């Protein structure tokens, strides 16, 4: 292009302050700065949005209505744009049908690969099934050794009762001479009488031959005749071979000659779990089914039936309705309504949950129910399968009587039929598990019966990317198959190699996208873009290094450089030092966050940045650094997970210290999230009566002697605090409740009879009804993006005139919501509760946020710190466990220091904190480190090292320790 730069003039979007700049094209450009300084606004809301908007505008009006419309950014001029592609973390698919394979489109090539190159095997007996033409069958027979004796036979009857005399008579009339009956050869004139009550097998002998030159014509006639009588099947009998090897069965159809199971011809649709042709009928291609989990229905086994042990009925009238029937059940099985569930016998528990049969016995197999319900492995033996089989068909017939108890779970299954509202209520008592038909493979048996060498498509998708590449490299095909295989193998290996290059070699293609971190999902899309081979595009990425161990960063940087060298502009929002230092151009925004940011502090090369006086430059040079704690806390006890086998974890016993800040580290795919999120968090959540999906597999969970058990568990992530502009920091932290109470107590409000609800913009009364309390009105533009205009009635203040007349200390409610946290704290200094909550927001570094700032404008880091502030506002936190997965995402080095102080403040209040993190500052600031590894995927799953950061550094087996050692050397040099 003629323009070597993307030229931006007077950008005022969000908090940007009329900035103008030139972003070099065809370079790797990194945008850095504090959280909320305007980085994402510049990269995504201006460069990407305008590039995408202009591309969409170039299409016809008809095409535009099917594409998402981007808002026009608030900027005076943008020139030099190219089509833009956004790779954000927030767009991780929650669709249960999206997998790594489908998103990267590798699965599409795999479906063709297995359809064209796969061989069918009988799902019942496992024998190969191959539809062959008559010519191919003749060629196979003539390939027998010269001089081989053989018979061409047509199978007529297989294991069918009857005398079959009519069939023998008809064959004699048609001129045939010999048959084989139940393995013995006879002429048609001396076939013995057959017992009509026994099953018989009959083969017609069409021809007897010796393999030699010149027999092809005769053989062709015999094969054609045998296939006609055998309805597409024939048997070649070799009498000179050993017993059991004499019969070779051929078929012109995809039918197992032994089991008579017919299989459809392989097609790409057969291997799609999103197609009715391929999806498992039971789970409709999801791979999982839901069932009612007894541990969620009755999480507190110390309660009795009449004290609310059964949560679905604890706060409703259902228990009173079922009380007579339950009392009668207790008389039959030795319990009363006052007996704690933990004192029930196994049979009584099974009857309570699954009902009784006609003889008063448990309707479901109760083996393992007590063990699992009391806190062991989550898998409920066959109970999930039992529910689906038994109750799906008869839920409508469930009846309650004193003579026979139908079971709590059948009654809840019946409730699932009462409509969507009931299903939502009952959802928290249900659990997901692998589909018992396809065992999580998502596909029909017919699709799984097709294999290439030793693997079907589901088995291939369960391999790690690294193993999948090795398997493909070992495949060799001949003849026609080689021509088909060559382009498919090339495309598959290329795309898998791209995934390996971005550090995702440990993932499997069957992994659900919903289970991936934002960083992993973004790198998957990055790998897809590498495979597309586009040039002249502007790629906009949001912290691609998130989720990557420092060991894997180099490969990621190589990938970004590869994109740039193809002739693309790569614009990266990033805080990682290595990525910043690898950039061609660095743009730093600041100086602060929110209203204190939005200015360009620096633009230039990395050497120029290192000489500049900016916040980022000071940290890169070592002039500023994050202080480390002077001493490490001692654990207040231990929580142990026994024999953890979740995902790639290898039966480990893992000890978590209580009352300290613990950092779980390790290379990508080593098992950190499997251990902390899927196992620790989910099992503790279930024990506390919370609903979670498919917790990891463990043998048990225990506490050390004297340790205080976890009584509350909180996962603090970076998801938004609200999905609409109505949500804001004031509403989330409950500050708004106090503010509304204060306004309701003013003389003006009391005189007018205004209650606190009058000062809410979410309900009628005080809000502006013209805009519904939004302050904006949406104008539909049909083929253009919707436009939001400030409400003419309230002028964007959300409230009606009468409400705004009420003032406190000279400000009305709208003006108070427009105050930054720092000013609001001084404004409400006479209200201790309010002042304390605002002080906590300041402590976590959010003093610049406006109280009423819409949640949709907050960054992930800001949202996370608001959540932490709400927890810090609680007076005491003993017995609470906080789990954070990569909390430094989106945070500048300066803000990481603030976050570390906040997490230590949680521990000082008596809480335990477990953090999954790669950031070396966070690791060095922890009391305890648990390092997973040694590699990723199948090479991980072990606890490599555990102890203080100093112990990890001293451990030669720890990859993390080596990076920590280098970091400590750098820190000492900076302090020098």
Model-derived features: positions:
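Conserved phosphate-binding elements of NTP-dependent enzyme cores
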Residues: 1-976
